[in-house]
Amino acid sequence: MAAPTYTWEYVTNLYGLGAPVITTLEATSGLYTKIGTLLVMSSGQVDEATASVVLPVGLAAETISVAATAADPVKVMLLRPGDVIKGTADADASSYSGFSGKLFDFNTDGSLDVADTSGGCASIWRTEDSGLTVFIVLTIFATS
């Protein structure tokens, strides 16, 4: 499976913390990433976030263009409470900006799933580009 179409970029931390730590974790077999791929933990190893992910761990800090084998090292930017990441929504999300109380999850292509407001993990802080560029804060993590 190829790396996702859409990736995320660290922007800031709302609590004034510095940039997140980048650490090396183990990859799952077959993992492909781009820098900024949203990642989750799966049986103690890092895997690409797919549809309906609600427990992310961080963002890929390196590109893996040849399928990883199980336990290959992969650099991951570990996300924390208050970290803002910027990415793409699959529809206009502007009506949800300003921490609307709705939580969203993600699509298989890596974009934010604006139509799904049940059981998600991402709250929208603000939007740009007619609501298609979103700045989100994750509310729960695999490390929580």
Feature-to-residue mapping (PLM):
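Surface-exposed, low-hydrophobicity beta-strand/loop segments enriched in small/polar/acidic residues
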Residues: M1-S144
